[in-house]
Amino acid sequence: MTRSLGGAELATSIRNDASVAAAALNDLGTRPKLAVVQATDDESTAWYVRSIASAAKRTGILCDIVDLGAAASTEQIRSTLVELGHDPDVHGIILQTPLPDGTDLDALREAINPAKDVDGANPVSLGRLVARLPAFAPATAQAVIALLDHHGISPHARTATVVGRSTVVGSPVAHLLVQRNATVTVCHRHTTDLAAGTRDADILVVAVGIPGLITADHVADGAVVIDVGTTATADGQLLGDVDAAAVDGRAGALTPVPGGVGPVTTALLLNHTVDAAGTQYAQTRSESVLAGFRSSV
């Protein structure tokens, strides 16, 4: 029987910690605030963004949904991100995808203030992650590691395969696993024999957005399988990248979809926002003290 690696309990714990920290900052006169920028008429995306806002409210975090519409240009989105980056009342910024066709996503990610980049999208954040310097990791990638830790699964000295190499999940997950001393293989669309790259892995992370891609043939006996994929169907179901029925009994453990990585990702975004608010509060206080000192001499 395959063990289910649910994320609800961990997500609740993370949100509770964030709520306590948010309340402490509120007592100091700083209310953590998250801004989510979207430019799409995709209803599943709008639902996801609303779920973030709802979770933020329950955690004591303000959340502004900045909806620029599906016709927004790169420059419109970029100027909004820059403005939010300079707004002292905004502590965290998320650029939600998908975006309109033709949008320069790289330019937009570069426009996110790294101090407020709570989803680790800016190249500065990603570079610091690779260099093992303090930075916010992409929340979904961090959620994968957090789930492993929560369920007592150590990547140390184990083999891991990551299917997918996006800058928001696959690549950062691979780096985080290496930092935890796993031996990591990355597979992608140009991998000629996917099963050859996955079937010997102790830990298999799948993040490509192709429902049912991974079957029993891709999974080693007893492997830990982390399914990051979430594809919405026309009737409102969420499907993972792993054929859960096919790997049941073969995989040692599997994250459910929904209810696995997703809730932890949202909780970490809120936790990052509170952390960013605390850092920005401390920096402002330090600057105020320094200004007061300078004016007295």
Curated annotation (Swiss-Prot):
Keyword line: Amino-acid biosynthesis, Histidine biosynthesis, Hydrolase, Methionine biosynthesis, Multifunctional enzyme, NADP, One-carbon metabolism, Oxidoreductase, Purine biosynthesis
Pathway: One-carbon metabolism; tetrahydrofolate interconversion
GO annotation (BP), single: methionine biosynthetic process
CDD domains per the UniProt record, alphabetical: NAD_bind_m-THF_DH_Cyclohyd
Annotated positions binding NADP(+): 164-166, 230
Catalysis: reaction(s): (6R)-5,10-methylene-5,6,7,8-tetrahydrofolate + NADP(+) = (6R)-5,10-methenyltetrahydrofolate + NADPH; (6R)-5,10-methenyltetrahydrofolate + H2O = (6R)-10-formyltetrahydrofolate + H(+)
Name this polypeptide is given: Bifunctional protein FolD 1
GO cellular component: cytosol
Entry-linked Pfam families: THF_DHG_CYH, THF_DHG_CYH_C
GO molecular function, one term: methylenetetrahydrofolate dehydrogenase (NADP+) activity
Subunit structure, interactors included: Homodimer.
EC number of the protein: 1.5.1.5, 3.5.4.9
Similarity-based family: Belongs to the tetrahydrofolate dehydrogenase/cyclohydrolase family.
Tagged with keyword Oxidoreductase: yes
Gene: folD1
Protein role: Catalyzes the oxidation of 5,10-methylenetetrahydrofolate to 5,10-methenyltetrahydrofolate and then the hydrolysis of 5,10-methenyltetrahydrofolate to 10-formyltetrahydrofolate.
UniProt cross-references to InterPro entries, sorted A to Z: Aminoacid_DH-like_N_sf, NAD(P)-bd_dom_sf, THF_DH/CycHdrlase, THF_DH/CycHdrlase_cat_dom, THF_DH/CycHdrlase_NAD-bd_dom
UniProt xrefs under HAMAP family: THF_DHG_CYH
Protein species of origin: Rhodococcus jostii (strain RHA1)
Domain of life from the UniProt record: Bacteria
